Amino acid sequence: MAAYAAFKHVELYNVGKAKKRVLRAPGGGSSDIFGSEMPQTPRGHVKNRMASNIFAAEKDNGVKNNVRQGAHRFYFIGDAPRRGQKTVDSHNRLFGEPTRPITPAKNHMKSSIPFGGQNTEAAAAQKLLTTNGHYNGKSGSVSSASSSVSSSTENLKMNSGSRGVFRNMSTAPGSKSNPIPSVRDPACPLTPEPSIPEIPPPDVLPIDIPCKEIEVGDIPADNYTYNQSDKRDEAIQSRCDSGTNPEKPYSLNHMEGPADLQEPMHPCPDTLKEAAQQCKMDSRNPITGLGLNGDGVGGLKPKKQKNREGNPVTGEGYKPGANDFHQRADSSQGGTPIINKNRVPPGGYSSGLW
């Protein structure tokens, strides 16, 4: 029961309740694939832009295409031009309109402000005469002249207003024609007075600043003793009271009194030599066993006295009686002589054979 209750909603409630679907033809219900006799709805005319109509058959007059390829457009005989096209007048296009108003060119180099007693009409005529004479179209039109005269009249009205303002400004109490008398300031003197000298900026060198007498304070008592470096006698100077002494440098500010000549001149401490270390007779080198001889470094080996009277190669010339050389003793029995092993070998003791 558990399995049935868990899965009964999958298919049991949907039996007989499936969706009702109606299959349609690939081309629709009115497609002629299945032999339908229903009338087709007319489709809108779609222009094929890839097709050419040069060699096409002649169409009806109502559907004929009058536009041909190329920069120029031609029309068939009997065809009317397209609607909405205006007629072109060659005369107006080439020579302009016959009744075109005159447009006088403005002369920017001349001023329109009139000076003198001319009236408005004379000023307008003078302005027409001073123009460059360039006109667009045919001259002799009275309307253009009247328009220019009216514009000149407006300019004269504006200029007259500005001239009146200029006249009022020129008659003001502060103008040049009516100057206001100046009143002298009583605080300002008539004679010029020198001003306070400017303080130089801090970056100016001291040599550029003018010298000023500055009061010097009390002189220390030590400076009264010596005021020059060569005051003392050079004969009584020593290294102890000179500038080369590191312990007592020679200074002008702190100087000692004159030296007492009754005291003996003792040498400086840096000139004294240290006493030599006493030699210990029992000091020996632990490696060689020789004495250090008091030098504390290692000592020297004792020199062995050598007898240089004989020839070490041949053995001749040595004094008899020494341990290093013995004469050969011949046997009294006449036998083989006894060779002393202590004799000097041939080649000497320095030979590599021995």
Swiss-Prot record:
Output compositional bias ranges, type Low complexity: 139-152
Q: Which GO terms describe its biological process?
A: positive regulation of microtubule polymerization
Keyword Cytoplasm in record? yes
Residues found modified as Phosphoserine? 30, 112, 141, 152
Chief location of this protein?
Answer: nucleus
- From which organism does this entry originate? Drosophila ananassae
Q: Where is the composition biased (Polar residues)?
A: 153-180
Disordered: annotated segments:
85-107, 135-187, 222-257, 287-354
Protein name stated in the entry: Microtubule-associated protein Jupiter
Q: Name one GO cellular component term.
A: cytosol
List, alphabetically, the InterPro entries matched: JUPITER
Record field: transmembrane:
none
Gene Ontology molecular function, alphabetical: microtubule binding; structural constituent of cytoskeleton
- What protein family does this chain belong to? Belongs to the MAP Jupiter family.
Q: What does this protein do?
A: Binds to all microtubule populations.
Instruction: Please state where this protein is localized.
Output: Nucleus; Cytoplasm; Cytoplasm, Cytoskeleton; Cytoplasm, Cytoskeleton, Spindle
Alphabetic keyword roster = Cytoplasm, Cytoskeleton, Microtubule, Nucleus, Phosphoprotein
Q: Give the modified residues of type Phosphothreonine.
A: 41, 99, 103
Q: Where is the composition biased (Basic and acidic residues)?
A: 85-94
